[in-house]
Design a protein with these regions (language model features):
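Membrane-proximal interfacial segments on either side of biological membranes
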Residues: 1-160
């Protein structure tokens, strides 16, 4: 799956690269998903640029943590001059069972669980800070809904 084609049609933010995945044990009840196991990983079958935009990083942060705290990092120091970052690998597993949604990183290095791993010289790692966390599917749906709402502009508050 070409991420650039997919992300050009949804408001998550621009990503380039190829992914592959599987969806297993998918069931619907009362018009909404009730169970699934989704795995998404980088596809290295062709050499294509792998990059993620700042907007996509912010939106994936909302999905994975429920907050935009990564915005502070992206708007500080040298980071504010970049609109996208290279990455080396994507590894994500989402499961839903008994109304509990779980998001896990499949890349494990140095005791950390990564959803997205930075490239060798530059980039931003997306670390799953709370790997054992599960939330209700309703809460995850609300997080997804927040992606399509206008963001409030942060205001610089003078220190005094």
């Amino acid at each position: 799956i070409d991420l650039e084609e997919v992300t050009s049609n949804i408001k998550i933010g621009r990503m380039t690269g190829l992914i592959q995945g599987s969806l297993k044990n998918f069931t619907m009840e009362y018009g909404q998903p009730s169970r699934f196991d989704l795995v998404i990983t980088s596809d290295r079958s062709r050499k294509v640029p792998q990059a993620i935009s700042v907007d996509a990083i912010k939106n994936l942060s909302i999905i994975s943590t429920g907050s935009e705290t990564i915005s502070d990092i992206l708007n500080s120091g040298l980071n504010r001059f970049f609109s996208q970052y290279p990455y080396s690998e994507i590894g994500i597993r989402c499961t839903l069972s008994d109304d509990l949604f779980s998001l896990r990183g499949l890349i494990r290095e140095g005791g950390k669980e990564y959803l997205i791993r930075r490239s060798t010289f530059r980039g931003i790692d997306m670390v799953n800070q709370n790997p054992d966390n599960s939330i209700s599917f309703k809460d995850m749906s609300e997080r997804m809904g927040r992606l399509f709402q206008p963001r409030q502009q942060s205001k610089d508050v003078p220190s005094g």
